[in-house]
Each structure stands twice: as structure tokens, then as C-alpha cells.
A protein has these predicted regions:
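Extended, non-catalytic substrate-recognition/exosite surfaces adjacent to catalytic cores, especially
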Residues: 115, 273-288, 292-301
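Glycine-rich beta-to-alpha transition loops that act as phosphate-gripper elements at the mouths
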Residues: 131-141, 254-257
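Short catalytic-loop micro-motif centered on adjacent basic/acidic residues
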Residues: 99, 132-134, 270
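Small-residue-centered hinge/linker elements
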Residues: 2-129, 139-235, 293-343
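Flexible, glycine-rich surface segments
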Residues: 209-282
Length: 343
């Protein structure tokens, strides 16, 4: 009975809102209501210091992927871009703290985030640039470091797992299993490389030069990663001067896919400071040249229409098994900036 009353009230509010919007289209002097593009955000105070200025915290957690994270179809990348845009447009926001706890993920998704951070700092598209300070949690490896590289200042804990600068791609070969069960594929293709990375081929069916082509692609994306590290750390050192850390001369020797502790990353110049989130906040205020600031975060807001969209789902819910751990969802043939320890 109570649930029925709640649903009736929600329905009445929704009908009233839609009616108001409909009438506004035909009322003189009223502007047309337009739904904003991108995720809807609410500003939430994490720490209210009754200050004039603000600093925004943007979280990057888990596997970095360009996948929808809610019923509205927006991806994690959309949400991060929207948060940066809100911080850019708010004159009271003087800096962003990028809180990273991620093993990395998809190459393109990581690059989209890196690009958004770089544009935020340089103030492209006619907007004023603002500093971004990265605060690494327990894990900021591979793509997690990639998105941190363009930040003006990077703080890591001594025990942070970072580094893992490199690219990985899986290609499974199951031809031996197919032979055991009596299966043999018939493939019709337009060129000898059209079924590149197909796992249904035997070793002698793989065309000469295919492995070299795949490795060339890996090396190209790997080179991009190293350029992002070199450019980001060089630009940061120019801004920070003697306060920051410069990459050591042989830094590429440590960019071979190995993981580094926060202490090692500091020693080789991959991070500027050893500390925690509070230290990153203090440094952000110093870089922004402010003595005090309110700490805020932009959280995604869901309105009544989103609620009814959820109730109106017609598809059956998927059955999910909780294994107690967050396993990377890696697909064969995809490029990843990802640290993926074998379990």
C-alpha cells in the first residue's frame, strides 16, 4: 500500500513537470527548456572550511574503460569530462585534485582522460588554465600513471604500486582444442591478414610478417605512452622548478613494464612528492596560491525521469556472481595500458 502511494506521488510529479514544460513552449516571454548535454552534476562539500575559494576532487578508480556506468548511457569518461568542465567554469575553483586508484585499462579511454586533463591545465578553447595535482592511492599503474603524467604535481605514497609503463594485447589460440573435438573452421576473407589474431588457425597457417605487424602496432602505442610521460614530466618540471622532481637520465630503463613502489617512482622522477591525500591538498593550495579552500566533489545527479527509466526497464536482470575481487575485463585483440598480475 505504501509503495503504491509513493509510486502514485512520483507519477503525479512527473506528469506535472511534463505539463509545465509543454505549456512553456506556448507561453509568450518564456524560453524553451533545454536539457543540458552530458551528465547532471551536484556539487557536494567534502570539507567546508568557510573559505572563499574551492578545490575540486575528481576520482579515477578501477578499470579505465569507455563503457556506460548507469542507466543514462553516460560513460566514466563523460563523467570525468563533465567534472572538469564544471571546475573550469567555476571561477572559485582554483585547482583540481585527481585522486587515482587504478591499474589502468583501455588505451583510448586512458588517452581521452589524459587529453581532457591536459586541456584543463592549459586552458584551451579560450578558458583559463588551472593546475591539476595527482594523488595516487594504493594503485596507479600503467593507464593509472598515464592519466597522472600530465598533472603539474604528482603525490604518491611510499607503498603505492605505480609504473607498469607499457602496452599489452592478448591473442588466444584454441586450434589445438578444436582439433581434439573434431572442429575445423572454413574462413573466407578478402586478404591474407583479414583474420589477423584469429585463434582458430594453426601455427603454420599464420602468414609471414603477421607477428611483426602486431608488434609494430604495440611498439607505436608504447612509444606514445613514453612520449606522454616525457612531455608531462618535462612540462611539470618547468613549472615547478627545483621544488619538483625531474626524470632521471635513464628513466626509460624503468619504463619496460615493471611496477614501481612509490619510493622508487620518486627516486626516478616519475612523481614529485611522497605523501598522502592530505599532502596533495596542501600542495594544491600552495600551487594555486591560496591559504584556504573548501574541498568539493561533483557527483552525478539522477532526477525523476531517470527513476522512471529504471522502473521501466523491460529486460531481465543479469545474474552476477561476486568473486570478492575486481577482475580486469580484458578482451582479446584490444590494446591496454593495464597492469594485470597473474592470479
Amino acid at each position: 500500500m505504501i509503495l503504491a502511494i509513493i509510486l502514485f506521488v512520483l507519477l503525479a510529479v512527473s506528469v506535472l513537470a511534463n505539463f509545465t514544460q509543454f505549456v512553456s513552449h506556448f507561453t509568450p516571454g518564456k524560453s524553451k527548456m533545454v536539457r543540458s548535454v552530458g551528465p547532471k552534476l551536484d556539487e557536494v562539500y567534502l570539507e567546508d572550511n568557510d573559505a572563499q575559494y574551492k578545490m575540486a576532487v575528481v576520482d579515477i578508480r578501477g578499470i579505465i574503460a569507455d563503457q556506460a556506468i548507469g542507466q543514462d548511457g553516460y560513460t566514466a569518461i563523460d563523467l570525468i569530462k563533465a567534472q572538469l568542465k564544471a571546475a573550469q567554469e567555476d571561477r572559485k575553483v582554483k585547482a583540481v585534485i585527481l585522486r587515482v586508484d587504478s591499474p589502468g585499462g583501455e588505451v583510448l579511454a586512458a588517452d581521452e582522460i589524459k587529453r581532457a586533463i591536459a586541456e584543463f591545465e592549459t586552458g584551451e578553447k579560450g578558458k583559463q588554465g588551472k593546475p591539476v595535482i595527482a594523488s595516487m592511492g594504493s594503485l596507479a599503474a600503467s593507464g593509472g600513471y598515464y592519466v597522472s603524467a600530465p598533472c603539474q604535481w604528482i603525490v604518491a605514497n611510499e607503498m603505492t604500486i605505480t609504473g607498469s609503463i607499457g602496452v599489452i594485447m592478448d591473442a588466444w589460440n584454441y586450434r589445438g582444442l578444436m582439433d581434439k573435438v573434431g572442429l575445423r573452421p572454413d574462413v573466407y576473407k578478402s586478404g591474407k591478414f583479414k583474420d589477423m589474431l584469429s585463434g582458430s588457425r594453426s601455427t603454420n597457417e599464420i602468414p609471414a610478417g603477421e607477428r611483426e605487424m602486431v608488434q609494430k602496432l604495440i611498439d607505436e602505442v608504447y612509444g606514445k605512452f613514453k612520449n606522454v610521460v616525457a612531455d608531462g614530466r618535462s612540462a611539470a618540471h618547468e613549472k615547478n622548478g627545483s621544488e619538483g622532481k625531474a626524470l632521471v637520465g635513464n628513466w626509460q630503463d624503468y619504463a619496460d613494464g615493471r611496477v614501481l613502489s612509490g619510493s622508487e617512482a620518486f627516486q626516478y622522477g616519475f612523481v614529485d612528492q611522497l605523501g598522502n591525500f592530505d599532502d596533495a591538498v596542501k600542495k594544491a593550495k600552495k600551487i594555486a596560491n591560496i591559504s584556504s579552500a573548501n574541498l568539493i566533489q561533483y557527483q552525478q545527479r539522477y532526477d525523476i525521469s531517470d527513476l522512471f527509466h529504471l522502473f521501466g526497464k523491460s529486460q531481465a536482470p543479469a545474474i552476477k556472481v561476486d568473486l570478492g575481487m575486481d577482475l580486469p575485463k580484458v578482451e582479446a585483440g584490444h590494446l591496454y595500458y593495464l597492469w594485470r598480475p597473474e592470479k
